[in-house]
Amino acid sequence: MASGKMRIVVLFGGRSAEHDVSVLSATNVMNALDPAKYEAVPVFVTRAGQWLLSRFVNGALEKPSSGAELCLVPGGCGRAIVVPDAGAPYEADKIDIIFPVLHGLHGEDGAVQGLAQVARVPLAGCGIPGSANALDKDIAKRLVNEAGLSTAKSVTITREEVPAFSALEQALGLPIFIKPARQGSSVGVHKVVTEADYQAAMSDGFTYDDKLLAEEFIQAREVECGVLEDEGGALFVSRAGEIVPAESHCFYSYDAKYIDADGTEIKVPAELPEQVENEIRAIATRAFRVLGCDSMARVDFFVTADRRIVLNEINTIPGFTDMSMYSKVMAVSGVSYPEIINRLVAHGLARGS
């Protein structure tokens, strides 16, 4: 911190199918970083996995196709080498903390978190175990079910073990939802009613992951809340928010989330009885701990008409786009966007020390 400001590397882009969502999220993070407090260094992770120095100009992040690469030094405690297109490599100014805004595989699955640990540089956000456990929906379900938490019934599908459509229909009923086990943002998710739907869903799903989940349909409201851990380990759980997909979308799809501006109505806070909301927040805390999460997560639920609460998913790097729920439920709970950033940084520094 030679300048008196904390040097924070913001990673965005990435190799996953959620690359474009990451760019939107990181743009908002860059806007929220206090320039009087932080020296923000945006680093674009290409679809091939290169870390290229970027710039934030007029509210937009540059996405270079080539240029200077940033390489962390193993055990370097924040040291990094810049490899330019031309000329000799040189040592960059010391990095104080890494802030990954990478969604999905190779960013939210423990990979970048492990790299930061190898380099001995602090990292904002969830650590290795929670990231890996939460991103894999199959493993996450097994862990929270073992802890006694309710989830949708599901069948795990691999390339080697593909059940017949009739078997899934018998086990789960119709419709069925097919989803990649290790993707987010509803990428590769399909609503299946017929054998033809099933074959199409399998073909598409396996382009995103080698493991899929077939899940039962639950007629319910979709409710989410945010968890934020302070530097001392205390958890703050936000009010709940509700997602209501437009009638033009049969479920909360990628298009409803990010493409169609009218695809979703978000109600913050959700209109829920106090007892139900308190139970949702308690389950969110329990699931967060069971999966080994720390720092931050968004926890998603189904709430049925008879007030049964079903845990859906946990996202350890939730979306930070204009339409994303995490910052909205935190704001209505009294935590502003810049304060989220400050708390994540403080937590990462405390854990790194």
Curated annotation (Swiss-Prot):
Cofactor binding annotation: Binds 2 magnesium or manganese ions per subunit.
Binding site for ATP: 169-224
InterPro entries xref list: ATP-grasp (IPR011761), ATP_grasp_subdomain_1 (IPR013815), D-Ala_lig_Van_CS (IPR000291), D_ala_D_ala (IPR005905), Dala_Dala_lig_C (IPR011095), Dala_Dala_lig_N (IPR011127), PreATP-grasp_dom_sf (IPR016185)
The gene coding this protein: ddlA
Any one annotated GO CC term: cytosol
Entry's Gene Ontology molecular function annotations: ATP binding; D-alanine-D-alanine ligase activity; metal ion binding
Positions bound to Mg(2+) 2: 313, 315
Catalytic activity, EC: 6.3.2.4
Name of protein: D-alanine--D-alanine ligase A
Amino acids binding Mg(2+) 1: 300, 313
Xref: SUPFAM superfamilies: Glutathione synthetase ATP-binding domain-like, PreATP-grasp domain
Matching Pfam families: Dala_Dala_lig_C, Dala_Dala_lig_N
Organism of derivation: Brucella suis biovar 1 (strain 1330)
Catalysed conversion reaction: 2 D-alanine + ATP = D-alanyl-D-alanine + ADP + phosphate + H(+)
Cofactor: Mg(2+); Mn(2+)
Keyword terms, alphabetized: ATP-binding, Cell shape, Cell wall biogenesis/degradation, Cytoplasm, Ligase, Magnesium, Manganese, Metal-binding, Nucleotide-binding, Peptidoglycan synthesis
